[in-house]
From Swiss-Prot:
SMART domains: zf-3CxxC. InterPro entries: Zar1 (IPR026775), ZAR1/RTP1-5-like_Znf-3CxxC (IPR027377). A zinc finger (3CxxC-type) spans 195-280. Interacts with YBX2. Expressed in oocytes and zygotes. Predominantly expressed in maturing oocytes before maternal-to-zygotic transition (MZT). Less abundant than Zar1. This is Protein ZAR1-like. Keywords: Cytoplasm, Developmental protein, Differentiation, Metal-binding, Oogenesis, RNA-binding, Zinc, Zinc-finger. GO terms for molecular function: mRNA 3'-UTR binding; zinc ion binding. Transmembrane segments: none annotated. GO terms for cellular component: cytoplasm; cytoplasmic ribonucleoprotein granule; intracellular membraneless organelle.
Amino acid sequence: MERLFCVPCGYGTTDPLTYPGPWRHCQQQNWPQNMGAPIFLARLRVPANVSQSCMNPYNRAQLQAVSTQMDPNLSLWLRSVHTTEVGVQVSLRVDKSVQCSQGSQTLHSSSLSDRTSSRKPTEAWEVGRRALIRRPQDGEDEESQEELTGPTEASQLLLPTWSRDREEQFPRLKELGEEYAHSPQDRKGKQFLELKYGYFHCKDCKRRWESAYVWCISGTNKVYFKQLCNKCQKSFNPYRVEEIQCQTCLRVCCSCSPKKRHIDVRRPHRQELCGHCKDKKFSCSVFFSLK
């Protein structure tokens, strides 16, 4: 059982622990011959010119990552060659980038496929666990790149390209947003609605009838939407709503002990405000006078 284990970018080779033992000649001819021992039993052979190869930060980072997986003690020896610590970030959609003490840098792969492929540089944000690093474009000053670490700084990220194009097409969006901003002074002149449950009051005929939840102007008892009075059939806006309160504590939602009430069996809806006429053909006000 022998096979080769290739290290990416051609950094060194691996040999089995028994190399160059005599066990190769003892194998039978009919057995399938595999080149090399299992991966977890392989050991790394570092080339003699490793110091020259490590001068390239991209190659050094790859070698250090491979050597750490094979032998953790070997990474300490590699650090003595060059004192700059390098961390590699790999993304499937954007190029590899390295963040070191000198600043963020974009490193292109040395493979032939990446050299031949010509694509436009795309602006992207690489999100890490602790920082957001912006990939610099070609010809951009490295000193102008900043590392965003805090939530307040992360909120200052540039908008995507599609949103920039949209702002160019609609330049008035930002101005209109500022005009309709909800400031404390603007809220005073605007009306907000809230639900209330109480009695309707008609000012003309002085009639009152029970109502369900209606939309009232916030802070008042005025009904916002127009409704017709059952008696005078006048569309008066707004109606006034009197909240149904407890006679003892004068609260809408009270915790007083319930009292026995006289309930008319023929007209239970008058005593129980539970909406008996809901989803029915005729409402209760058609048959009964709720004055």
